[in-house]
From Swiss-Prot:
Binds 1 Fe cation per subunit. Its EC number is 1.13.11.20. Keywords: Dioxygenase, Iron, Metal-binding, Oxidoreductase, Thioether bond, Virulence. Disruption phenotype: Displays reduced hyphae formation in the presence of cysteine and leads to attenuated virulence. This is Cysteine dioxygenase CDG1. Induction: Expression is under the control of the ZCF2 transcription factor and is regulated upon white-opaque switching. Transcription is also up-regulated in both intermediate and mature biofilms. The keyword Metal-binding applies. It holds the Pfam family CDO_I.
Amino acid sequence: MLLNQYTFSAERCTTPTSISHPPLACPTSPPPTNSLNRYQHKPVTLAPTVDHGCEINGTTIDCIPKDSKFYQLIMDLKQLLAGKGLSNEDIDVEKVKQLMADYDSNEIDWQHLALHDPSRNYSRNGIINLNGNANLLILVWSPGKSSAIHDHADAHCCVKMLAGELIEHLYDFPDHEGEELQCRQETSMKRNDVGYINDSIGLHKMSNPLQNRVSVSLHLYTPPYASMYGCSMYEASSGRKHHVDMSKYYSWQGQLVNEKESSTC
């Protein structure tokens, strides 16, 4: 499948530089805290499993050249998170962000992992399970499309722009159902920008403002609560909350897994 300058493989699996734009967390937001605890999740680690005959959530990766900087980023993240408990208080977010910022995006490194379903707003491609307490994904955003307004299930979310542009729309949690959600901040992210959000900052939605090309972003979620327990999306007109299962990837390590039923919010 040829999309703009990228060629994305869609084979079904049959075996088990400097940041010049503001970050996601705007300066006027409350300072991030590692103590979230909105959901009270049980401390169960993310384990490998099988989906449509393909092993997902594995902790190793062989489909990236070991001499690439992208592979080195993954290994650095894995080492940083090694030995950490499955608790949001254990994570050094600033070090995670710095590692992601140090990587200069190169399409050759990751384009075979960035599969895209043009019929959906965005496609979630699983890359690796980091020690059972974090997962790394590449999201491919269809032109002009966005996610729903959503939370992050008491997890930290670090985002690295790999290509294109995204706009973050930031919202406060509603005090009660029936309250219309008002966007309080919009932030643009372009190639190599790194951002961060957790539930103490608020809700957000992400949108691709480009009308003629996809945008691509790298996401690290730690702990990986959304994949394990799901998250919540919110109706903009009423603040009504809906639980969403986020366990189904569109692809895993470049192999198509869920062509028709992958999870998005």
